Amino acid sequence: MQMVPSLPPASECAGEEKRVGTRTVFVGNHPVSETEAYIAQRFCDNRIVSSKYTLWNFLPKNLFEQFRRIANFYFLIIFLVQVTVDTPTSPVTSGLPLFFVITVTAIKQGYEDCLRHRADNEVNKSTVYIIENAKRVRKESEKIKVGDVVEVQADETFPCDLILLSSCTTDGTCYVTTASLDGESNCKTHYAVRDTIALCTAESIDTLRAAIECEQPQPDLYKFVGRINIYSNSLEAVARSLGPENLLLKGATLKNTEKIYGVAVYTGMETKMALNYQGKSQKRSAVEKSINAFLIVYLFILLTKAAVCTTLKYVWQSTPYNDEPWYNQKTQKERETLKVLKMFTDFLSFMVLFNFIIPVSMYVTVEMQKFLGSFFISWDKDFYDEEINEGALVNTSDLNEELGQVDYVFTDKTGTLTENSMEFIECCIDGHKYKGVTQEVDGLSQTDGTLTYFDKVDKNREELFLRALCLCHTVEIKTNDAVDGATESAELTYISSSPDEIALVKGAKRYGFTFLGNRNGYMRVENQRKEIEEYELLHTLNFDAVRRRMSVIVKTQEGDILLFCKGADSAVFPRVQNHEIELTKVHVERNAMDGYRTLCVAFKEIAPDDYERINRQLIEAKMALQDREEKMEKVFDDIETNMNLIGATAVEDKLQDQAAETIEALHAAGLKVWVLTGDKMETAKSTCYACRLFQTNTELLELTTKTIEESERKEDRLHELLIEYRKKLLHEFPKSTRSFKKAWTEHQEYGLIIDGSTLSLILNSSQDSSSNNYKSIFLQICMKCTAVLCCRMAPLQKAQIVRMVKNLKGSPITLSIGDGANDVSMILESHVGIGIKGKEGRQAARNSDYSVPKFKHLKKLLLAHGHLYYVRIAHLVQYFFYKNLCFILPQFLYQFFCGFSQQPLYDAAYLTMYNICFTSLPILAYSLLEQHINIDTLTSDPRLYMKISGNAMLQLGPFLYWTFLAAFEGTVFFFGTYFLFQTASLEENGKVYGNWTFGTIVFTVLVFTVTLKLALDTRFWTWINHFVIWGSLAFYVFFSFFWGGIIWPFLKQQRMYFVFAQMLSSVSTWLAIILLIFISLFPEILLIVLKNVRRRSARRNLSCRRASDSLSARPSVRPLLLRTFSDESNVL
């Protein structure tokens, strides 16, 4: 009996990814021998827990997570200082805003977690049927244990990860959809091992005695390694290998199959679906980094203000009679307090007084803006694709503004730039090109050059080639007829994860060889004579991105064993006899230059003795539980040698609609586009010309195997080419200007082509003096090229390219877009990852930050949505710091007139409500709805994108502009009111207002000015903007009347009683408020007027030039200010 390996403690059961070793699962939880003791297994139960909190740990855990944010922790410290130290303001002023922010966030997270709890309970309490003692037993899903045999009916979801034992079909197959896991809606076929196919009843399945050895849980949906040991009465184990085709994943749905039986191998939080709950590594946008930098600057300003006021307080008190009057002598405790300690206490008090310069509510507003703003992408009807009946999807809202800051775009070719809708065009057999089909069934239409004729070229070779196309694939067949087997009259539907394979099978069908499907391990083919041929499928050597080929080993009805192989020319040519290559190579290169996807086809006969050895090696490799993939790859390499080349195929993959226009727009926007593909150079190069990545006047620089192999020493030749190309580019671009994007149109354009083997040579070059800087020189060349094509790239090489560019000086923002599993690595590596909802599965879309149906949607996503998102959030950030500096500066200036006594200028209610109620909604509405430029203009004039690149609106210049504007306005608020107070004319009875009235006037001017400033900046008015802007001002007035019109019993001092009403009873106060608001906004209004005059003048000159010039010219690009202040017409 096989013993259960040592298990981790129960606390480590869920979500552990870094486990080593294997686990043993006993089918039905029965021992394999009745005579030996059964050791109970310890695995996780089948409960799914996607929630973060429980009822008892929600409060401490949520608070801990929220106070890890620096701003929240800072305000907590301020609040504690107010509670413990005698500060000038009430703890409520900082405690209430902090409480509001914490409460809103906690409610949001608690509600989301409540929904997760509800969803978990629906899954955990669902009904399942377990086979126990040959009977169907009804249980709740959460009570499934590892080893239980589960019965699943049609259209039901698998409750855990199961190994398929049997199904209602005679061949032990079942159809599954995994739409809830990876978004793929097409049916996939899964298989049971042949020894358990017949066990299709509860009674028979209960007699099975077997043990499954498999890897520990890991999150990859497409990988599984295991074996099943089946014990007969003689206790002789029969071992069968298990792979992903035998594993039914939790969350997938059974389709077109009445029922199946499977044994649970992974349950609960160890299922692949649960392990995939964990999010991808957190990506931070450039705006977030700018916010942190601004916080540091304003924290420095805060500390400086507190230090200055503390110092000046003691300087002022050092003057005789300034410290204390004779009637207010110090107490004994105050006299005994150390002066240093008193100074430190005063310093803390000033920090509390000025702490509102740090915007605590900004984080909440930014989060709401990102979350709500992401819906505009999902709601955009232009992203809807009728073919797949889907639109765009936002997987993360944290990177919306990053879409407006992209410098480099890395794109896949197949399925991204092209349709991935393959059509068989032609083939080449033994160096002869065949195109089209004749009415004769005994020959193909052969064309060489311009001459078209029919020739009986070795009939056996033709049929061998077509049989290879019909047999060497993983295509599955679905017939609309439910009769026994496919017939000529039945309508065949081919299903495969690879559109190439479907195109080849359909191409063979055009020439008279029809693939009829796989039944009980036999592949059935109808030949040109309408005869049914059967081939026993012995082994499938699956395709992978490293090998770039796939093979099958079949046995004919005559008993011959054949290996058919198809793959890229670079993967097949080295494995066939050299004298067979040249004729076929000519056609392959010609087809590649025409933009077709090419595959080479080869075969070899395997002697029975050789097959016995091969079969033994394959079984041993498939049975391995450790390093199975590496062992199988080694066996595949040994098998796929000394083959005979038959021919090659050419498949057309049409360019996607508007792909060329999209790339042109990206180039015009200043973005550098790189194509990273696994295709051969000629095919990719042709596609790049077709999609206008390369222009006719683009000079191409090649770093490929072909150019490197001109020399005996590859590294020497590589070094020569790198130096040559760098000199040429440095001569063309003598200075590395900051605006190198504009230089593209002023100099000769260059494009670079590099293949995977040359890239490996660059990255892994020997560390001698001549080659240790290959990478640096290569990057210098790349930066000077307008476009780069990387062909023959492995998935990891794509990620290496992205990582190299990310680490360039200046940290350019990278975006990767692709549609297949081989693009996932570069999508995860880049700053922004975009997945195409393509025909090669949804792995790319599932691992991306955003997913769109087509490549053409990238244009609007970046040029319109990205532009607007960046402008909105950049304005939001600058505005928050601006309005808080306006808020605090009068408080700071007031200390010079109150003996630095820490006397607040504003009432505590105003301190509390300023950021929460009076000024928060207008900027939130602006940051969601603002369109400073029309969307059609943004997409039609890509050059506008360059105006905001490089995080332009959050650089030092705009930051200083907003800071000085706030300083100017804050000074006007305070000193304007102060000088108006010099006369007694503000009140009719000649009395002068008190300090609370003074502060209320300043605060009123402040609220109206910062709100009207936002109104001046708004270019796109909606009813929501009107409501929140004028509504906020009305609410402030109403609140002030309400707050000052009632004697509140919970207040010790009624400071504000009747202050606001008395203030507005004076006509002079009204005039003063209006005058100060106008003076504060006058620079803004003046700038608007000047910009409008300049705009009208520019339009008039442009009209004159157009009238005098017969050639149509594009409209000049209107410069976008580094702040969002408008030179467009204003509704206001």
UniProtKB/Swiss-Prot annotation:
Q: How does it sit in the membrane?
A: Multi-pass membrane protein
What does the PTM comment of the record read?
Proteolytically cleaved by CASP3, CASP6 and CASP7.
Any one Gene Ontology BP term: monoatomic ion transmembrane transport
Primary enzyme class:
translocase
Pfam families in UniProt: Cation_ATPase, E1-E2_ATPase, PhoLip_ATPase_C, PhoLip_ATPase_N
Q: What is the effect of changing V352F?
A: Impairs ATPase flippase activity
Anything known on activity regulation? The flippase activity is inactivated by caspase-mediated cleavage in apoptotic cells, allowing for PS exposure on the cell surface and engulfment of apoptotic cells by macrophages. The ATPase activity is up-regulated by aminophospholipids PS and PE and down-regulated by Increasing intracellular Ca2+ levels.
NCBIfam families from the entry? Answer: ATPase-Plipid, ATPase_P-type
Summary of the function given for this chain in its UniProt record: Catalytic component of a P4-ATPase flippase complex which catalyzes the hydrolysis of ATP coupled to the transport of aminophospholipids, phosphatidylserines (PS) and phosphatidylethanolamines (PE), from the outer to the inner leaflet of the plasma membrane. Major PS-flippase in immune cell subsets. In erythrocyte plasma membrane, it is required to maintain PS in the inner leaflet preventing its exposure on the surface.
This chain belongs to which protein, by name? Phospholipid-transporting ATPase IG
This chain's source organism reads: Homo sapiens (Human)
